[in-house]
Regions:
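Extracytoplasmic metal-acquisition and chelation regions
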Residues: 2-9, 15-361
Length: 361
């Protein structure tokens, strides 16, 4: 009887051990299968090309030029909407979960980018296209000359409605004299809100840096197509270098270096080619100039003999037309590349060069 009980116990133990071994084997097999499935999924993803999402039309154009047939590139911003003020929808967020790369401009353009970083899948990568670019301060008032004395005209108490000393080169304002928190110095006007100018793409040199950042990210995410990405980048750089040379040659002959523009989007272009932008509106083109600012722009144009005012596609040109009528200037259209176009980045910049060349000769 005792022997029978022992035999039953041994059999039960053997059965339990066998079940446990089978469960462990199944678990190991499942783990291996999941790993293989994940690897296969990744391989298939690369074979089908990278899934790339961008925040602007410019980053889309650069990414598409580098990816070629090795990737699908989608811009979040819908047709007919500009880069300023865009916010991604829940549908956009779902699309980002499936993206291999999300490429954004940076420089403060996309205030919502941190939310996207939390949304991306674990295999996705977020790329700041403007990384490594020296950013310009934004929010400068129109009468500031880039690299020159901030104020060229005299301020006095007779022609300004200020309660403080009207010397424009001596902004010694205390808190007691103002009811706002803006800091003032000899380089910045009271309309400077301390941000950075996000329009980095308006410099062809910056576009090359952006393209390099994008290519590096593609190679990291898809090393199997490294040769393709590098070859496409080299071809793109040739075109960008040629474009840069065209700008230098044409604008070196400009008789005037001042450009009155709809909003403060041309600082990087101006810096590269020795121009000075006089913006009617600020960085995001959402505010209109007050009567005093309008008067200053008109006076500056008359003093310097500026013959053109540059408007923008998709934007109301009423204020620019008013300034033009007051000064006898002509109106031409310059594109800050903030809305979608049938043309790519290089073609749009070539069009801008033709406009500038004809106006500044």
């Amino acid at each position: 009887m005792k022997f029978r009980k022992i035999a039953i116990a041994v059999c039960a133990l053997a059965l339990l051990t066998a079940c446990g071994s089978k469960q462990n084997a199944n678990a190991d097999a499942n783990s291996t299968n999941n790993k293989v499935e994940a690897e296969d999924k990744t391989e298939n993803k690369k074979e089908n090309g990278l899934n790339i999402v961008t925040s602007t039309y410019i980053t889309r154009d650069l990414a598409q030029a580098i990816a070629g047939d090795s990737g699908k590139v989608t811009c979040l911003i819908p047709k007919g909407q500009g880069v300023h003020g865009f916010e991604p929808s829940p549908k956009d967020m779902n699309m980002l979960k499936e993206a291999d790369l999300f490429i954004y401009n940076g420089a403060g353009l996309e205030s919502w980018v941190d939310t996207v970083k939390d949304t991306m899948g674990e295999d996705g990568e977020v790329v700041e296209a403007s990384k490594g670019i020296e950013l310009l301060a934004g929010g400068h008032h129109h009468h500031h000359d880039d690299g020159e004395e901030a104020h060229e005209h005299d301020h006095d108490a007779d022609n300004h409605d200020h309660d403080h000393d009207a010397n424009a080169n001596d902004h010694n304002h205390d808190a007691a004299e103002h009811d706002h928190d803006h800091d003032h110095d000899a380089e910045e006007h009271d309309h400077d809100h301390g941000g950075k100018d996000p329009h980095v793409w308006m410099s062809v040199k910056n576009a090359k840096q952006m393209a390099q950042n994008i290519a590096d990210a593609m190679i990291k995410q898809d090393p199997g197509n490294k040769a393709t990405y590098e070859a496409n980048l080299a071809e793109l750089n040739k075109k960008l270098d040629a474009l840069d040379t065209s700008f230098k040659d044409a604008l070196a002959k400009a008789k005037t270096k001042d450009i009155v523009v709809s909003h403060e989007a041309y600082g990087y272009l101006a810096k590269d080619y020795g121009l000075h932008q006089i913006p009617i509106e600020g960085i995001n083109s959402e505010s209109e100039p007050d009567p005093k600012a309008m008067k200053e722009i008109i006076e500056t144009m008359k003093q310097k003999g500026i013959k053109f005012v540059f408007t923008e596609p998709h934007e109301d040109d009423k204020i620019a037309q008013t300034i033009a009528s007051e000064t006898g200037a002509q109106v031409k259209e310059l594109d800050p590349l903030e809305y979608e176009s049938d043309k790519n980045y290089i073609e749009r910049m070539e069009s801008n060069l033709k406009v500038l060349e004809s106006a500044l000769q």
